[in-house]
Amino acid sequence: MAKSVAPLKSQLFDVLRKAWEDRASDVHLRADEAVVVRVDGILRPLEGLVPTTSEIHAFLDPMLREDQKRRSQECRELDFSCEIEKLCRLRVNVYVQRRQLCVAIRLLPQRIPTMEEIYLPKACVYFCSLNKGLVLVTGPTGSGKSTTLAAMLNRINSERACHILTIEDPIEFVYRNEKAMISQREVGDDTQNFAAALRHAFRQDPDVVLLGEMRDLETMQTAITLAETGHLTFSTLHTGEAAQTVSRIVDSFPPHQQEMVRLQLANSLAGIVSQQLLPLKDEKGRVAAREVLVVNRGVSNVIRENKLEQITTAIQTGSADMMFTMNHSLGYLYQNGFVSYEAALRAAFDRKEFRNKYGEPV
């Protein structure tokens, strides 16, 4: 279980507190270099604060168990999570570059936001109501995938008497049992790896499974099989649009298995939420733009027949089934003054189509 520690009186804990107040997403510590924070997607050095190796070790020490300290020394890298009392949660990666100690820290809220607070589309409510199927949340690193999944799982937690099993590396958000019983397993502490945890998941009587990331062929296959055998399964991929996501999964398998995987996806994939964060036009902060694919009979046939290039068209014509494209979401944000034309155009999956539909900025 991740530690909960009281904030210590040190410059580095003060940096965390200030970074959280400034809505930073990440903090980077490197021995004998200035601390760097990421705010609204942009890295910014903090002048005047240059921690030494011993200061970074002193900062990490109260967060780590003895076995984690040994693992960090033996492997030269470590993933763990931690909670700073009355402040925030941390997802921490300790590593070495050029024999220099480095720490990358992701700042996370202690309270899981509601689906309404992060403006999740109504298709996400539908996904939460399903009893089986594979739901994927995709996007680049730092696009809010973990937060989206946490909000969806907590909705299920508040509404259904079921067993929710999560497999994470490390655990990011901590859930409290409401109507559901929740089992959170952390790779390294509670299980050896994602693949082993997934193989044993079938015997742990889960109704809902969250796999932090589909990292390799084995985890992809097992996640698909879980969804196919009557479990509502959530996971993430670092892909963009929905069509690319389906192609990425299929192409991860050897050629002789790809037809079988397409058939499995056609039967088990429930939907894909693709998202990215854009800077707000006139104020600090970022806003999510999303694309939603809901797998109806038509989309299922497109996947089965390997006509993946038709997925985007299916989304464009699928508004009755709660679908919309990334370009549609970006156009809404631009036309309503949330983001600039330039930011929306940079984020568009189809820039030519976006220019034609929304024109040049006035």
List the model feature ranges, each with a label.
Residues 1-362:
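Short, flexible helix-loop junctions that flank or precede catalytic/ligand sites
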